Amino acid sequence: MPTVALEHPEAGPRSASPARGRAYWACTLFVALTALGAGVMDILHLQPLFGLLLHLGYPPYFATLLGGWKILGAIVLLAPRYPLVKEWAYAGMIIDYSSAVVSHWACGDAATALVGPMVSIAALVGSWYLRPQPRRLPRSIV
Protein backbone atom coordinates (compact mmCIF):
# COMPACT_ATOMS: atom_id res chain seq x y z
CA MET A 1 0.00 0.00 0.00
CA PRO A 2 1.47 3.41 -0.93
CA THR A 3 2.19 5.89 1.83
CA VAL A 4 1.02 9.48 1.80
CA ALA A 5 3.38 12.21 2.92
CA LEU A 6 1.68 14.65 5.26
CA GLU A 7 4.52 17.18 5.24
CA HIS A 8 4.04 20.63 3.78
CA PRO A 9 5.47 20.61 0.22
CA GLU A 10 7.80 23.52 1.00
CA ALA A 11 9.01 22.07 4.30
CA GLY A 12 12.06 20.39 2.82
CA PRO A 13 13.67 17.15 3.93
CA ARG A 14 13.68 16.31 7.62
CA SER A 15 12.50 19.80 8.56
CA ALA A 16 10.84 18.55 11.73
CA SER A 17 13.63 16.30 13.04
CA PRO A 18 14.20 16.70 16.78
CA ALA A 19 17.97 17.14 16.35
CA ARG A 20 17.44 19.94 13.85
CA GLY A 21 15.00 21.65 16.21
CA ARG A 22 17.41 21.40 19.14
CA ALA A 23 20.28 22.75 17.04
CA TYR A 24 18.09 25.63 15.84
CA TRP A 25 17.10 26.58 19.38
CA ALA A 26 20.67 26.23 20.68
CA CYS A 27 21.97 28.61 18.00
CA THR A 28 19.02 30.98 18.33
CA LEU A 29 19.18 31.16 22.12
CA PHE A 30 22.92 31.78 22.00
CA VAL A 31 22.48 34.63 19.51
CA ALA A 32 19.42 36.14 21.22
CA LEU A 33 20.82 36.01 24.75
CA THR A 34 24.18 37.37 23.61
CA ALA A 35 22.47 40.21 21.73
CA LEU A 36 20.16 40.93 24.66
CA GLY A 37 23.03 41.09 27.16
CA ALA A 38 25.21 43.16 24.84
CA GLY A 39 22.29 45.46 24.07
CA VAL A 40 21.67 46.18 27.74
CA MET A 41 25.40 46.78 28.29
CA ASP A 42 25.49 49.14 25.30
CA ILE A 43 22.46 51.17 26.41
CA LEU A 44 23.78 51.49 29.95
CA HIS A 45 27.33 52.21 28.70
CA LEU A 46 28.74 49.36 30.80
CA GLN A 47 32.25 47.96 30.52
CA PRO A 48 33.79 46.15 28.75
CA LEU A 49 31.60 46.75 25.68
CA PHE A 50 31.37 50.52 26.01
CA GLY A 51 35.14 50.89 26.31
CA LEU A 52 35.56 48.57 23.36
CA LEU A 53 33.29 50.72 21.17
CA LEU A 54 35.28 53.81 22.14
CA HIS A 55 38.55 51.97 21.42
CA LEU A 56 37.24 51.12 17.95
CA GLY A 57 36.59 54.80 17.30
CA TYR A 58 32.81 54.92 17.57
CA PRO A 59 31.10 57.89 19.30
CA PRO A 60 29.40 57.27 22.68
CA TYR A 61 25.87 57.76 21.32
CA PHE A 62 26.45 54.87 18.91
CA ALA A 63 26.39 52.43 21.84
CA THR A 64 22.87 53.52 22.79
CA LEU A 65 21.64 53.23 19.21
CA LEU A 66 23.30 49.86 18.65
CA GLY A 67 22.08 48.53 22.00
CA GLY A 68 18.47 49.32 21.19
CA TRP A 69 18.66 47.51 17.88
CA LYS A 70 20.35 44.49 19.49
CA ILE A 71 17.56 44.17 22.05
CA LEU A 72 14.86 44.49 19.39
CA GLY A 73 16.63 41.92 17.21
CA ALA A 74 16.84 39.44 20.09
CA ILE A 75 13.12 39.83 20.83
CA VAL A 76 12.20 39.36 17.17
CA LEU A 77 14.28 36.19 16.83
CA LEU A 78 12.57 34.63 19.85
CA ALA A 79 9.03 35.75 19.03
CA PRO A 80 6.72 33.50 17.02
CA ARG A 81 5.59 34.47 13.50
CA TYR A 82 6.70 37.59 11.58
CA PRO A 83 9.19 35.87 9.24
CA LEU A 84 9.89 39.04 7.25
CA VAL A 85 10.83 40.94 10.40
CA LYS A 86 13.04 37.99 11.42
CA GLU A 87 14.89 38.23 8.09
CA TRP A 88 15.61 41.89 8.84
CA ALA A 89 16.83 40.97 12.33
CA TYR A 90 19.16 38.34 10.88
CA ALA A 91 20.47 40.85 8.33
CA GLY A 92 21.02 43.53 10.97
CA MET A 93 22.90 41.14 13.23
CA ILE A 94 25.11 39.97 10.36
CA ILE A 95 25.94 43.62 9.65
CA ASP A 96 26.68 44.21 13.36
CA TYR A 97 28.95 41.18 13.81
CA SER A 98 30.76 41.51 10.47
CA SER A 99 31.34 45.21 11.24
CA ALA A 100 32.85 44.18 14.57
CA VAL A 101 35.26 41.83 12.80
CA VAL A 102 36.31 44.52 10.30
CA SER A 103 36.58 47.20 13.02
CA HIS A 104 38.87 45.04 15.17
CA TRP A 105 40.99 44.16 12.16
CA ALA A 106 41.21 47.81 11.02
CA CYS A 107 42.30 48.92 14.51
CA GLY A 108 45.07 46.35 14.53
CA ASP A 109 43.62 44.34 17.40
CA ALA A 110 44.91 40.84 18.06
CA ALA A 111 43.31 37.96 16.17
CA THR A 112 41.74 36.81 19.44
CA ALA A 113 39.49 39.91 19.31
CA LEU A 114 37.90 38.48 16.16
CA VAL A 115 36.84 35.22 17.82
CA GLY A 116 33.75 36.55 19.62
CA PRO A 117 32.11 38.19 16.61
CA MET A 118 33.04 35.25 14.37
CA VAL A 119 31.45 32.75 16.78
CA SER A 120 28.35 34.95 16.82
CA ILE A 121 28.29 34.96 13.01
CA ALA A 122 28.53 31.16 12.95
CA ALA A 123 25.68 30.80 15.47
CA LEU A 124 23.59 33.35 13.57
CA VAL A 125 24.08 31.55 10.25
CA GLY A 126 23.22 28.26 12.00
CA SER A 127 20.03 29.76 13.42
CA TRP A 128 19.03 31.16 10.03
CA TYR A 129 19.79 27.94 8.15
CA LEU A 130 18.05 25.65 10.66
CA ARG A 131 14.95 27.78 11.28
CA PRO A 132 11.68 25.83 11.02
CA GLN A 133 9.20 26.40 8.20
CA PRO A 134 6.83 28.70 10.16
CA ARG A 135 9.78 31.06 10.78
CA ARG A 136 10.72 31.22 7.08
CA LEU A 137 9.44 33.51 4.37
CA PRO A 138 7.02 31.90 1.91
CA ARG A 139 8.74 30.87 -1.30
CA SER A 140 6.64 33.36 -3.28
CA ILE A 141 8.41 36.26 -1.51
CA VAL A 142 11.95 34.94 -1.83
Across the structure, where does each feature detected by a protein language model lie?
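Membrane-interface extramembranous regions
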Residues: 2-142
